[in-house]
Structures are given as C-alpha cells and as structure tokens.
C-alpha cells in the first residue's frame, strides 16, 4: 500500500508492507502530476518493488485534485488532507489525544482523540510565507538558502521583546517573549538578521495560533508535522515552546500526511 502526499512544492511518498513502513521519499517537480508519477516510479525502483506488488495507491494533498484516473491502473483512492494529516500525526505519537499542527506551505490544526477527529482551522503562514517575504526582501525564495542564512542572524536585533519594554517579567510572560515581530528592524538591518526574523515570526505564530485554536479542547499535547519541521533552525525555535507546552516533533514528521493517507479508515477513502 502506497501513500502519496502531493503538496504545492513537494510530493512525499511512503509504503507499507503489512504493518511495516518502508523508508519514505520526497520528490520535487514543477508539475504536481509529474511529481506524482516521478515519485511513484522512483520509489518502486529504489525499493525493488514491482507494479503488481502495489495493492493500492492512496493520494492526498492539494495536488490530488489534479489526479482524475487510477495511477498506473492500480486501485487508487483519494483521502481528505485533514483526515490524512490527523491520522498520520496520531499514528506517530503514543498520546491518546493530541492537537496536530501541520506546518507546510500554509498551516492548519487538527484535534485527534481515540473517538474523534476535528479540523480546528488554520492560518496563512508557512513555508510559502518565508519564501515569499524573502523573495521581496532578500532576493531569494529558496528556503534551503533562507533557513541556513537565518542561523547566522540574531532575531533579538529584529524582534521587540517584553524585556525591551519592561524591567521585570509580566504575569505569565518572560522577558524574552516576543512583543512585536520586526519591532526593532530598520533599513540598516543585516540580511541574516532579517532572515532570522522572518523564520522566527512564521514558526512562532503558527505555534501560537495552534495553541489558541485548541484552547477550548482541554488538550495540552501538540504534535508538529510538515515540511518546516525538518529544518534544524525551526526545531530550535520550537524548543522555546517546550517550557510552556508539551510539543513534540516525531520521526518522519514531514511524511505524516502520506502515512495517514494509507492508514486512514476505509470510510474516508474515495476510489477514483
């Protein structure tokens, strides 16, 4: 059984032999359909699989809407992205109830318990925001250039923090908490500091939005998945939240949605 998450920029693929998951793979392509078929063929080749070995293909993600026929004539099913994300995130944790925060081109939040799955909403912040703002300000939209550049920067030179406004911490707010993203930035700010500010702003506000969206659920455990979670710099920012909330980035976090497409309940799978 093969799960494929066709994203806006990257296609991710996993396979299960029984309960055993084979190593996942990610493929980039300009065309989402080309990315799907390229990922599928390459995955079969690298894992010594034959087409007839494929019991079913389970596709999800924004690009799945472009797939209108069975993949290489194998049984093919579409799975709602929210369902796939919630299912995959839940599979990667040992918690009984969690909030799954998906951090991709944009971001959304799913509440998952043993008996319920609910989409809580989302925000228009993610990798697309980082690339778009950086294209305008830093003249590069390549996230593999932006994120390492941010490592060299100092976000304290860009963001205004509580400590810049108050001598003592406020109730529930430490002095290093952000008061205003880019509140210190000016025309002389260095590119590496700006990059740090952009990355920090996006990651921080996705996490904050996810926490606010889940406020009435009573759930305090958060699972972060999606493409942004694989970057070391993003993981460093997320570490700051661990003192306040139980935030986990599981192994294979960027493949959770592809995993969920395979293991989602049969009732959530629509055959093409």
Regions found by a protein language model. Give the residues of each.
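Short beta-strand-loop/turn "lid" adjacent to the catalytic site in phosphate-handling enzymes
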Residues: 25-29, 40, 45-81, 117-119
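Glycine-rich phosphate-binding/hydrolytic loop that grips phosphoryl groups
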Residues: 87-92, 130-135, 247-272
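Adenine-nucleotide phosphate-binding core of ATP-dependent small-molecule kinases
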Residues: 171-221
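Glycine-rich phosphate-binding loop plus the immediately following alpha-helix
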Residues: 90, 114-171
């Amino acid at each position: 059984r093969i799960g494929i998450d066709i994203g806006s920029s990257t296609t991710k693929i996993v396979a299960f032999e029984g309960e055993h998951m084979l190593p996942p793979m990610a493929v980039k392509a300009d065309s989402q359909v080309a990315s799907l078929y390229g990922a599928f063929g390459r995955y079969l080749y690298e894992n010594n699989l034959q087409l007839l070995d494929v019991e079913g293909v389970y596709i999800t993600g924004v690009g799945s809407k472009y797939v209108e026929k069975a993949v290489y004539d194998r049984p093919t099913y579409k799975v709602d992205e929210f369902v796939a994300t919630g299912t995959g995130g839940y599979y990667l944790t040992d918690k009984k109830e969690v909030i799954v925060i998906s951090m991709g081109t944009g971001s959304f939040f799913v509440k998952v318990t043993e008996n319920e799955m609910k989409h809580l909403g989302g925000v228009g912040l993610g990798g697309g925001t980082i690339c778009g703002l950086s294209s305008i300000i830093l003249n590069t939209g390549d996230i593999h250039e932006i994120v390492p550049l941010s490592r060299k920067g100092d976000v304290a030179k860009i963001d205004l923090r509580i400590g810049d406004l108050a001598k003592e911490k406020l109730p529930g707010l430490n002095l290093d908490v952000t008061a205003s993203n880019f509140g210190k930035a000016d025309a002389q700010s260095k590119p590496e500091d700006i990059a740090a500010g952009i990355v920090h702003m996006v990651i921080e506000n996705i996490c904050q939005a996810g926490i606010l969206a889940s406020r009435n659920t009573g759930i305090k455990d958060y699972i972060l998945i999606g493409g942004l979670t694989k970057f070391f710099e993003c993981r460093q920012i997320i570490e700051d939240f661990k003192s306040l909330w139980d935030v986990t980035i599981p192994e294979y976090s960027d493949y959770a949605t592809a995993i969920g497409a395979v293991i989602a309940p049969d009732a959530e799978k629509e055959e093409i």
